[in-house]
């Protein structure tokens, strides 16, 4: 029985409810009065239920699709303005005991070299990332209790935060590791992590168990209930994601929204972020062998509807996607992107060797400077801000500020201050020239006179060598 307040995976992600929802969506995909009613509700920026959003996803009317895209862009700007938060993944270890059939790190893949970074290696990677200009990382590691125990992860986090090379500093470490215990989540909280990220991969239980035939990840309930344990362990911000291409996209979309509704119902706080990765080629993984791949057009529609249905969430897209796709979905709701990513262990400090393994092939291979310049040329502010985490604006406090729109009073000036840091320390002359012009224009767009004056003062101080100012 479907119950969003239940702590049992098969009740808050109820297969029968998803099937009923998809049937309802099919029956109403051409019901224009209902669709207009749903769109009118969406314009209130309070979100949509999984059933309402599924009707919009099923609708194929071109005029409605145009309206969905326009509304997604409006909602994104209402909550996040024209800012795009920058981050990079940092792969610590590709040792893994699981048998995931879509990931090259699976245990049966014997021809890839296995590698685990030492703390000295971690420091080298962090320096390389700082020298690009990154301030925010998402650490990644395979599940292996012998090679990658929680103590190893904690040591890596400590090392990352300790490195300050020249003017560089990693100010926020997000963590994407396997589902674990409440006790271990408490340890991650104490280590000062930002968001705990865990991709569900697929919400379809039967498919999930086939795709994860061996290893601890085979346990669907333990994996699906991980966010509840994380929040019980004190982690304020959690990030959801499915791997589109493993199962029918409409099923996954519905399940993802049900998970968000569950977190809101039980904990009073929905997902801080939602990621939208698609299955991509990697080492011994051929995505064409999976039957549920989605087109760029469908992918864009999913992104737009996630923004409409969960307006407060940060939406993340990685370098799995091409520059063309990233540019489209940034205008449909995506608010965070990775830049200059390396998806192999040790990929930043060393030249990638042909024998190195990547978790997935990188489609957007531009440098961080090139990505920053591209964003500004498309009228977006690249933001390296991490202030909310360090000012305690997390969990329900962040959500209340975000839902009310007040978060922009902090985020807009903070984005400009951190962009100024990037321009002073890491940018090419061409990028710096474009950025200086953008900062001057955007400072004048800060509505509060006092905030605008303080922000201008901080930007001037950064120009004279001082760092790390924030609202």
Write out the residue ranges for each language-model feature.
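An N-cap/entry alpha-helix motif that binds or orients negatively charged groups
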Residues: 40, 44-84
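Conserved C-terminal portion of the radical SAM core fold
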Residues: 141, 195, 200, 221-285, ...
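Radical SAM enzyme core and accessory elements
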Residues: 1-37, 41, 327-335, 341-471
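Short glycine-enriched, charge-decorated loop/helix-capping segments at active-site entrances
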Residues: 211-217, 288-292, 357
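Canonical Radical SAM [4Fe-4S] cluster-binding loop centered on the CxxxCxxC motif
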Residues: 80-121
């Amino acid at each position: 029985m479907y119950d969003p307040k239940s702590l049992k995976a098969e009740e808050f992600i109820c297969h029968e409810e998803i099937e009923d929802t998809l049937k309802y969506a099919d029956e109403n995909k051409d019901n224009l009065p209902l669709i207009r009613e749903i769109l009118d509700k969406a314009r209130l920026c309070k979100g949509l239920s999984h059933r309402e959003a599924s009707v919009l996803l099923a609708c194929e009317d071109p005029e409605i699709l145009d309206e969905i895209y326009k509304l997604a862009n409006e909602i994104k700007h209402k909550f996040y303005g024209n800012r795009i938060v920058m981050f990079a993944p940092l792969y610590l270890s590709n040792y893994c005991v699981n048998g995931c059939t879509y990931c090259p790190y699976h245990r049966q893949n014997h021809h890839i070299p296995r590698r685990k970074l030492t703390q000295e290696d971690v420091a080298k990677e962090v320096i390389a990332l700082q020298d690009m200009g990154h301030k925010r990382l998402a650490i990644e590691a395979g599940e292996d209790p012998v090679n990658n125990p929680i103590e190893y992860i904690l040591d890596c986090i400590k090392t990352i935060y300790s490195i300050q090379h020249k003017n560089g500093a990693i100010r926020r470490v997000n963590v994407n590791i396997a589902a674990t215990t409440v006790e271990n989540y408490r340890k991650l909280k104490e280590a000062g992590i930002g968001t705990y990220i865990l991709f569900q991969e697929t919400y379809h239980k039967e498919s999930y168990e086939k795709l994860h035939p061996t290893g601890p990840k085979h346990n669907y309930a333990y994996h699906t209930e991980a966010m509840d344990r994380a929040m019980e362990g004190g982690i304020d911000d959690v990030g959801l994601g499915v791997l589109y291409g493993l199962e029918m996209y409409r099923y996954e979309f519905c399940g993802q929204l049900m998970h968000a509704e569950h977190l809101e119902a039980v904990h009073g706080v929905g997902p801080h972020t939602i990621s939208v990765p698609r299955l991509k080629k990697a080492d011994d993984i051929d995505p064409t062998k999976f039957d549920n791949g989605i087109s760029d057009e469908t992918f864009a529609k999913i992104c737009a509807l996630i923004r409409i249905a969960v307006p407060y969430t940060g939406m993340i897209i990685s370098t799995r996607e091409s520059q063309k796709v990233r540019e489209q979905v940034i205008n449909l709701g995506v608010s965070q992107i990775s830049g200059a990513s390396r998806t192999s262990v040790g990929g930043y400090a060393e030249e990638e060797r042909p024998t190195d393994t990547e978790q997935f092939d990188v489609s957007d291979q531009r440098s961080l400077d090139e990505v920053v310049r591209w964003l500004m040329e498309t009228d977006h502010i690249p933001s390296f801000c991490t202030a909310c985490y360090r000012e305690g604006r997390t969990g329900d406090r962040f959500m209340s500020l975000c839902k009310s729109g007040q978060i922009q009073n902090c985020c807009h000036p903070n984005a400009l201050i951190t962009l100024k840091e990037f321009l002073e320390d890491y940018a090419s002359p061409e990028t710096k020239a474009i950025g200086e012009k953008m900062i001057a224009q955007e400072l004048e767009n800060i509505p509060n006179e006092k905030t605008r004056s303080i922000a201008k003062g901080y930007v001037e101080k950064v120009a004279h060598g001082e760092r790390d100012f924030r609202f």
